């Protein structure tokens, strides 16, 4: 079993100024290749703390991947930290230096002297070429009493890291021979604790494993199995996956890479969809934007415009814009005024006494369904929840074949 840890270096990551998408990418890549990931750590640009974190990671793991800190400035300290832990002295590598100079010359520029540190190497490090940037990576091997330890240092920009990981790192790694297969089931309309209760003992077994995750679109359930061969792993996975599918069929809208909007598009089965939004800042239309069935949309909070789209003055006066009746009228209006086969509406309250309330409605001409959302969060969260709830409503109603 190959044990791994990820260390993300950068004060901007530590303070949340930039989302650490690289660690998520690496975690997925490792998991798909049967590597056991034990920890992910974020450290600021401090030589002492990065060195300490790296030493600790090496004491626990076989593979440590360090992301970031390979730039040319004084606060890019990953090379120095690795050298300190390895007790080796970095020195300029003539070939790397010539390569760096060539990059700048090809652009008609002179390489700044500060970039010379990007040509550093230590005796135990192999340089990893960077095809899209100026920061080479390091691939470091160290023999210990516990066996070989590997440190991989990669630059922080995702487009550089991802390409180098696939082209330079993976071919060099002693990956385990075991095969890992998995399927993720997407659900909505049920809480994570309820999903766990329904699955019962399945969530406590090891291989296949069954894990639940809360997502913006609902609760995901990942079923994974590993074995010596892919065929054996799939044979292990199949009965447990069938069991999970059966238990959660009522709430399931898709699997793996499918999106909720895509699932709605499939259920439309050639019919067109018109959308009217009020107070949602176009959140629903944005989710549907890439779907071929998405025919037209009207996004407005102007009462006069909404009345021309089907909202009655009586409803506006007596129930208000943020109401179930308003959502119903606008869903019907989406069919009529946007010339669509199916109408979907969402009305959201983000300020005032109805802040956090939202209503969505679906109208097929023969069926009308609504859903209510109460979410006392910030406006962006309320809009997001309302848009997802509208898609969930559309999927459930359409999947039921017009019977709700």
UniProtKB/Swiss-Prot annotation:
It comes from the Bacteria. InterPro entries: CinA (IPR050101), CinA-like_C (IPR036653), CinA_C (IPR008136), CinA_KH (IPR041424), Competence-induced_CinA (IPR008135), MoaB/Mog-like_dom_sf (IPR036425), MoaB/Mog_dom (IPR001453). Belongs to the CinA family. This is CinA-like protein. It comes from Deinococcus radiodurans (strain ATCC 13939 / DSM 20539 / JCM 16871 / CCUG 27074 / LMG 4051 / NBRC 15346 / NCIMB 9279 / VKM B-1422 / R1). The lineage of its organism: Bacteria, Thermotogati, Deinococcota, Deinococci, Deinococcales.
């Amino acid at each position: 079993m190959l044990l791994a840890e990820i260390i993300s270096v950068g004060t901007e990551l530590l303070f949340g100024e930039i989302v650490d998408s690289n660690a998520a990418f690496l975690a997925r890549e490792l998991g798909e290749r049967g590597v056991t990931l034990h920890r992910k750590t974020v450290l600021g640009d401090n030589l002492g703390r990065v060195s300490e974190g790296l030493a600790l990671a090496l004491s626990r793991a076989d593979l440590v991947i360090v992301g970031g800190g390979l730039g040319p400035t004084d606060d890019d300290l990953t090379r120095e930290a690795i050298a300190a832990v390895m007790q080796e002295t970095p020195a300029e590598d003539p070939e790397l230096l010539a390569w760096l100079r060539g990059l700048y010359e090809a652009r008609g520029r002179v390489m700044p002297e500060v970039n010379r540190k990007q040509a550093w190497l230590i005796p135990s490090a192999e340089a990893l070429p960077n095809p899209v940037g100026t920061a080479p990576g390091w691939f470091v091997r160290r023999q210990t009493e516990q066996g070989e330890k590997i440190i991989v240092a990669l630059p922080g920009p995702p487009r550089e890291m991802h390409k180098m990981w696939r082209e330079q790192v993976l071919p060099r790694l002693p990956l385990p021979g075991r095969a890992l297969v998995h399927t993720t089931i997407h659900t909505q309309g049920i809480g994570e604790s309820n999903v766990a209760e329904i699955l019962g003992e399945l969530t406590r077994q090891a291989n296949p494993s069954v894990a639940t995750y809360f997502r913006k679109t609902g609760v995901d359930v990942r079923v994974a199995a590993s074995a010596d061969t892919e065929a054996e792993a799939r044979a292990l996975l199949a009965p447990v996956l069938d069991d999970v599918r059966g238990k959660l069929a009522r709430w399931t809208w898709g699997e793996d890479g499918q999106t909720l909007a895509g699932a709605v598009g499939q259920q439309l089965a050639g019919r067109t969809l018109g959308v009217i939004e009020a107070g949602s800042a176009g959140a629903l239309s944005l989710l549907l934007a890439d779907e071929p069935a998405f025919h037209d949309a009207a996004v407005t909070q102007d009462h006069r415009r909404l009345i021309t789209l089907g909202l009655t003055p009586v409803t506006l006066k007596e129930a208000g814009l943020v109401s179930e009746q308003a959502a119903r009228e606008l869903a019907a209006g989406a069919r009529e005024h946007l010339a669509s086969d199916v109408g979907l509406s969402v009305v959201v309250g983000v300020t005032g006494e109805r802040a956090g309330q939202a209503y969505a409605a679906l109208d097929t001409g023969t069926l009308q369904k609504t859903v209510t959302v109460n979410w006392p969060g910030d406006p962006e969260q309320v809009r997001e929840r309302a848009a997802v709830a509208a898609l969930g409503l559309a999927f459930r109603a359409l999947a039921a074949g017009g019977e709700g």
